């Protein structure tokens, strides 16, 4: 779809499942299961919705999904459905890995950066060899020195091979990485999580990452148990949603399995809801 001078298109890396309780934190199951039906292992289905941005001859990719390096045990644990993969989705858009000029990671958890690298001839290498990969410097540092709480989410094979070939470009805070494409720190899920603002001709799209992973997480207290700083998530959500409402932003949801994007509104009780926009 057109957004001013940009063309933006969701590209999927498939679907997977995570524990519903972890996805909704302190929200009781009796409330969250109204919108997200769990399976017999209490897992809910989630999308892997990356975003392709095109302007002129440049192709920018926001997040890279899970990738395909993991073994059968990992795939079973997370009930991964890989039809299609991200590379399949890009191919349907007429693109090969060499055609991607920039990859922006919201953060480096395995379901957002797993497709950064690929296994070839027994080695793990960059999936997009001609791209600059962009992430907050603090996020990379936290991933590189992950602790007992965070280690399961950060898998070194998703980011260290890119450092070996000097494809990383680290940013510190809000940065316009291309004219009209700005990364903004939206801390809470991680210390240096970032979301991406795309702006052209008075129109704005905002790729949320894990700040608001699904439409079901629009209510302010609906915060993931995975978030390292949940009270910061609360405040970040508040200002993002208020600004999105006042400025009519198009919000893009990375993990919703059904709704990809929409514009936030408020009902008579002052609660946020979404008007879906089809891409």
PLM segments and residue spans:
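Active-site metal-binding loops of divalent metal-dependent hydrolases
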Residues: 13-15, 64-67, 108, 138-139, ...
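Conserved nucleotide-sugar donor-interacting segment of glycosyltransferase catalytic cores
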Residues: 114-130
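Conserved beta-strand hairpin/beta-sheet module of binuclear metal-dependent hydrolase folds
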Residues: 2-8, 12-93, 195-210
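Cap/insert and terminal regions of metallo-dependent hydrolase folds
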Residues: 77-88, 201-279
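Short, P/G- and charge-enriched loop/turn segments at secondary-structure junctions
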Residues: 36-41, 121-122, 183-184
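Metallo-beta-lactamase
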Residues: 81-95, 99-111, 127-185, 235-248
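Residue-level marker for buried hydrophobic side chains located in beta-strands
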Residues: 60-62, 104, 133, 205-207, ...
């Amino acid at each position: 779809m057109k957004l001013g001078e940009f063309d933006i298109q969701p590209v999927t890396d498939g679907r997977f499942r995570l524990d519903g309780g972890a996805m909704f934190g302190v929200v009781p199951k009796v409330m969250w299961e109204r919108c997200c039906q769990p399976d017999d292992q209490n897992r809910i289905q989630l999308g892997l919705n990356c975003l392709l941005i095109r302007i002129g001859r440049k192709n920018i990719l926001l997040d890279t999904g899970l990738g395909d390096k993991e073994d059968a045990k990992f795939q079973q644990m997370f009930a991964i459905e890989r039809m299609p993969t991200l590379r399949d989705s890009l191919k349907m858009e007429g693109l090969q890995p060499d055609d991607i000029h920039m990859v922006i990671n919201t953060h480096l958890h395995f379901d957002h950066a797993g497709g950064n690298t690929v296994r070839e001839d027994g080695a793990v290498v960059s999936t997009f060899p001609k791209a600059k990969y962009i992430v907050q410097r603090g996020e990379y540092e936290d991933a590189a020195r992950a602790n007992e709480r965070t280690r399961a989410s950060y898998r070194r094979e998703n980011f260290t091979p890119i450092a070996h070939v000097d494809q990383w470009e680290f940013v510190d805070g809000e940065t316009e990485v291309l004219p009209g494409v700005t990364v903004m720190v939206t801390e809470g899920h991680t210390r240096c999580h970032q979301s991406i603002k795309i702006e052209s001709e008075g129109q704005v799209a905002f790729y949320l990452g894990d700040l608001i992973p699904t439409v079901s997480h629009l209510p302010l207290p609906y915060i993931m148990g995975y978030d390292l700083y949940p009270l910061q998530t609360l405040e970040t959500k508040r200002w993002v949603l208020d600004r999105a409402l006042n400025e009519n932003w198009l919000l893009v949801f990375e993990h919703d399995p059904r709704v990809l994007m929409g514009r936030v509104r408020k009902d008579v009780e002052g609660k946020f809801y979404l008007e879906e926009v089809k891409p």
